[in-house]
Amino acid sequence: MARTTPIELYRNIGIVAHVDAGKTTTTERILFYTGVNHKMGEVHDGAATMDWMAQEQERGITITSAATTAFWQGSTKQFAHKYRFNIIDTPGHVDFTIEVERSLRVLDGAVVVFSGADGVEPQSETVWRQANKYHVPRLAYINKMDRQGADFLRVVKQIDQRLGHHPVPIQLAIGSEENFMGQIDLVKMKAIYWNDADQGTSYREEEIPAELKALADEWRAHMIEAAAEANDELTMKFLDGEELSIEEIKAGLRQRTIANEIVPTILGSSFKNKGVPLMLDAVIDYLPAPSEIPAIRGTDPDDEEKHLERHADDKEPFSALAFKIATDPFVGTLTFARVYSGVLSSGNAVLNSVKGKKERIGRMVQMHANQRAEIKDVCAGDIAALIGMKDVTTGDTLCDMDKPIILERMDFPDPVISVAVEPKTKADQEKMGIALGKLAQEDPSFRVRTDEETGQTIISGMGELHLDIIVDRMRREFNVEANIGKPQVAYREKIRNTCEIEGRFVRQSGGRGQYGHCWIRFAPGDEGKEGLEFINEIVGGVVPREYIPAIQKGIEEQMKNGVLAGYPLINLKAAVFDGSYHDVDSNEMAYKIAASMATKQLSQKGGAVLLEPVMKVEVVTPEEYQGDILGDLSRRRGMIQDGDETPAGKVIRAEVPLGEMFGYATSMRSMTQGRASFSMEFTRYAEAPASIADGIVKKSRGE
């Protein structure tokens, strides 16, 4: 099969940002200018192509990352070939950070959208951290330059100070707010004015207005200096006082962007059709093709110590990462995969190396939001949806049967909030199980479990909005009506002291008995470790080796159920160092029970404490309500961190326990007459004060 587009002409990019910075509108404009859509969709009309779930159109926010393919040859057709863009539009709401995380994992570059009026917002920082984690080169696009309070250079300064990255403006604004006219292209040193008659598809170039010439010269000098640092050749030329050509400036900026040293910064107003075509040009000029990023690394499934690499090349063995599972009403399960190397044709068999299972590829489609075009092959650099996969979950590797590899997996955060759901009727009961199973397969940050004591179904997620959407989707997509309980906080338990505990389970009353006996030393685990670190210190066979795994299992099972108030015990070290056995009566079950009994005693002997999730909260409020907001956050046991000012008002940052934040949106609205906004995200677990912990422990014991 001949590749239709050379890999050098690919750009796999994500459009990422804070809620309401204008991501989806920007993506809609991209689809319009690249000719995929003949009519623009507006978010506030509920007609945006990329927002294809019913709830997205109603709420005006993007929840799932829709993937789409588009082609671009330049705003003035200046490139010799058409470039192929695979674009992923991601949600900006903090409850859906998981969608952003998994998109960034498979992208080669990102366009981070900021609002010219609001600047760097809390979610912008989260997205930026995620992009740093996966070393994603990026452009900054300062949108909404027509809005009141928009100030391009202020946002540039914030990117530098708050995000700690080196922004390099390659454009400047001509006018701002309602007088925003266009931009200055600092590379060509021309003023650009957009043509309203064709919805900003074309523009005219003029000389830079005299009053902006000095500013343009100053920022152009910064840009050239940034480009010249790319390599010795350009540096020498720059130091010798020679003029760098346009090609050299672009090459220098490109090299440093791909190395994640700088962020080229551009501007526009997507809604007013000013600037998006130049952003597409910048994606081609400065963001990498799949062949320009380092080879993807992985391990050999048979030998975890053996590191393997796959280069973005059709001749290499096939490897791909399944980064998203979606349920489609017509074809069933869609597995979105990013192909890193090799070629795959429909009908081929691949290995799911994480699960060790063979999968046959039925059909493959390329997605345009929720429209599908069937394709026969996918090559290195492609993003496509595979139909008919049975056992694939997010983060699994698909690879060549004969050349297995496990690509680096994605880390998903644990949920911080739970609610009980109950089906309204008997008919809903069965459907609810199926619906929740499918939704959990799609979204790794969403969990479902059954409470053993009450028999209730408990769903857990990243925030109230996250769970609202899940329940809403159950109703719409699976016709399941359910009642929702009050939100519950996902507490954790941890021990403070090191202690040695004897676990003894003996039942001997004639016939085959039970005999399990062990001594275990428990200690708090190392910082940053979540689970159990188990050490076998048995010498001389006082406990036979075959019973050691049963002891570990007994500890792990008790950790799941906790020792204090029924919440999972985390961050534990356990060393089994002594014990005894009986030739006839000892068995695995007896040792498992003995270890479990020893672990239970940690509530007293280990000084077990309750941990509560703490949220990073950021409130933006008009100045006159600042005192009320601060007082209210303090009453909620909040620790005020710092604050600053933006045109939107005062910004207050605090850390507040999640248990105190339920219903905060409503009380904040009434306190500020609906003029303040807030966002929060999980930051860490911290020890709950005794007064709170005692109440929770008593409640769990039914006192």
Curated annotation (Swiss-Prot):
SUPFAM superfamilies xref list: EF-G C-terminal domain-like, P-loop containing nucleoside triphosphate hydrolases, Ribosomal protein S5 domain 2-like, Translation proteins
Binding site residues for GTP: 17-24, 89-93, 143-146
Regions annotated as coiled coil: none
A GO molecular function held by the record: GTPase activity
Major localization class: cytoplasm
This protein's GO CC annotations: cytoplasm
Localization, UniProt: Cytoplasm
SMART domains cross-referenced by the UniProt entry: EFG_C, EFG_IV
Biological-process GO terms, alphabetical: ribosome disassembly
Record has Nuclease as a keyword: no
Sorted UniProt keywords: Cytoplasm, Elongation factor, GTP-binding, Nucleotide-binding, Protein biosynthesis
Domain tr-type G: start-end pairs: 8-291
HAMAP family according to UniProt: EF_G_EF_2_B (MF_00054_B)
Cross-referenced PANTHER family: RIBOSOME-RELEASING FACTOR 2, MITOCHONDRIAL, TRANSLATION ELONGATION FACTOR G-RELATED
Protein purpose: Catalyzes the GTP-dependent ribosomal translocation step during translation elongation. During this step, the ribosome changes from the pre-translocational (PRE) to the post-translocational (POST) state as the newly formed A-site-bound peptidyl-tRNA and P-site-bound deacylated tRNA move to the P and E sites, respectively. Catalyzes the coordinated movement of the two tRNA molecules, the mRNA and conformational changes in the ribosome.
NCBIfam families: EF-G, PRK12740.1-5, small_GTP
Identification of the protein by name: Elongation factor G 2
Originating species: Pseudomonas putida (strain ATCC 47054 / DSM 6125 / CFBP 8728 / NCIMB 11950 / KT2440)
Gene assigned in the entry: fusB
